């Protein structure tokens, strides 16, 4: 049996506006309506919403999720396309990790320079972040 939008949202732990947004973006299909005019969503749609939510938690963009659905919804070159996508996403994650490690090293260095409770205008952390003497 199908679900109304509020039931779908509750089952997937999202809000109704999120469901409508995914529909507008083409991530889920517009559902048929019952005789009362209510949209009735299938369990397959619920699975897609849960998949979208999981991918968002893993920091995938909606554009990337849309691309994944394009591959999943077409049986053709699925494995080849998924491999290429995975390679690209792995490189992107490696770049993000390197960026975060650079930020971490900078913050560790700045923490060592911080004497304690100097006024803000003499704080070496603020000076460095604003492009001051310790660039």
Swiss-Prot record:
Coiled coil: none annotated. Residues 1-71 form the HTH merR-type domain. Residues 5-24 bind DNA. Pfam families: MerR_1 (PF13411). Hg(2+) binds at residues 79, 114, 123. Keywords: Activator, DNA-binding, Mercuric resistance, Mercury, Metal-binding, Plasmid, Repressor, Transcription, Transcription regulation. InterPro entries: DNA-bd_dom_put_sf, MerR, MerR-type_HTH_dom, MerR_fam. GO terms for molecular function: DNA binding; DNA-binding transcription factor activity; mercury ion binding. SUPFAM superfamilies: Putative DNA-binding domain. GO terms for biological process: response to mercury ion. Homodimer. Mediates the mercuric-dependent induction of mercury resistance operon. In the absence of mercury MerR represses transcription by binding tightly to the mer operator region; when mercury is present the dimeric complex binds a single ion and becomes a potent transcriptional activator, while remaining bound to the mer site. This is Mercuric resistance operon regulatory protein. The lineage of its organism: Bacteria, Bacillati, Bacillota, Bacilli, Bacillales.
């Amino acid at each position: 049996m199908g679900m109304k939008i509020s039931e779908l949202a509750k089952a997937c732990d999202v809000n109704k506006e999120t469901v409508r947004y995914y529909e507008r973006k083409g991530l889920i299909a517009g559902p048929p309506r019952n005789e009362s005019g209510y949209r009735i969503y299938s369990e397959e749609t619920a699975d897609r919403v849960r998949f979208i939510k999981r991918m968002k938690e893993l920091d995938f963009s909606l554009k990337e999720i849309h691309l994944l659905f394009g591959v999943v919804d077409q049986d053709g070159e699925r494995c080849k396309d998924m491999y290429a996508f995975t390679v690209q996403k792995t490189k992107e994650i490696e770049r993000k990790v390197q960026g975060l490690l650079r930020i971490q090293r900078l913050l560790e260095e700045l923490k060592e320079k911080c004497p304690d409770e100097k006024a803000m205008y003499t704080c070496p952390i603020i000076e460095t972040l604003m492009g001051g003497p310790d660039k």
